[in-house]
Regions:
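N-terminal intrinsically disordered, cationic/polar leader segments
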Residues: 1-30, 43-108, 114-129
């Protein structure tokens, strides 16, 4: 199964693609091919957006069966729309082939100050119980 985990906030996006779908053997797996096309499109869009200055802080790591990337972007940007389109396509694949891939939205990326604030609020809640 391929697991796709992503975090999205108003200014930052991060995603990881991990594993082989297992729909068919390597080279004949249409689910894995669909996921690979979408991951590749996202990486190409990131490279172009980085060159044009639309995104900043772009990072990408690739290994066999694993891709992780992250970047910062503006609210109304082309990359924001690209991310939403690719996530929608991944969700459609998941709907059809849910036994072979899973798309997981994780908590939005927070700044350190927001994270510390939330930790303090959680601690207050635990103390009140």
């Amino acid at each position: 199964m391929t697991e796709i985990k992503y975090r999205d906030s108003a200014a930052r996006f991060a995603v990881s693609f991990c594993g082989h779908a297992g729909y068919a053997e390597c080279g004949k797996d249409i689910v894995c091919a669909g996921i690979s096309v979408l991951a590749s499109e996202l990486m190409l869009a990131c490279e172009q957006a980085q060159r044009s200055g639309e995104i900043t802080d772009y990072r990408c790591a690739e290994e066999s069966g694993y891709v992780k990337l992250s970047f910062s972007y503006g609210e109304g940007s082309f990359m924001r729309r690209t991310v939403r389109l690719i996530l929608a396509c991944l969700r459609l694949l998941e709907k059809e082939y849910g036994s072979y891939l899973r798309v997981v939205a994780q908590s939005p990326i927070q700044s350190q100050s927001q994270s510390r604030y939330n930790e303090g609020e959680n601690q207050k809640e635990r103390m009140a119980l």
